[in-house]
Amino acid sequence: MPQISRYSNEQVEQLLAELLNVLEKHKAPTDLSLMVLGNMVTNLINTSIAPAQRQAIANSFASALQSSINEDKAH
């Protein structure tokens, strides 16, 4: 069941496009892109979430990420 977001699809898509443009501008390979994005998530959690909630937020994020992974074999 999809979650309802307080953000519009337009807001999400615009920010996603801008982030992808930065990665493409720097010709970042997939592994570097994932490393940088992972570090960004870690930094956001550590600087914006109360310590008592960080583990739960990280677990929720990891679960949502795993649920969104496409299983088809196309590369």
Swiss-Prot record:
Protein name, entry field: UPF0352 protein YejL
Pfam families to which the protein is assigned, alphabetical: DUF1414 (PF07208)
InterPro entries hit by this protein: UPF0352, YejL_sf
Family under the similarity heading: Belongs to the UPF0352 family.
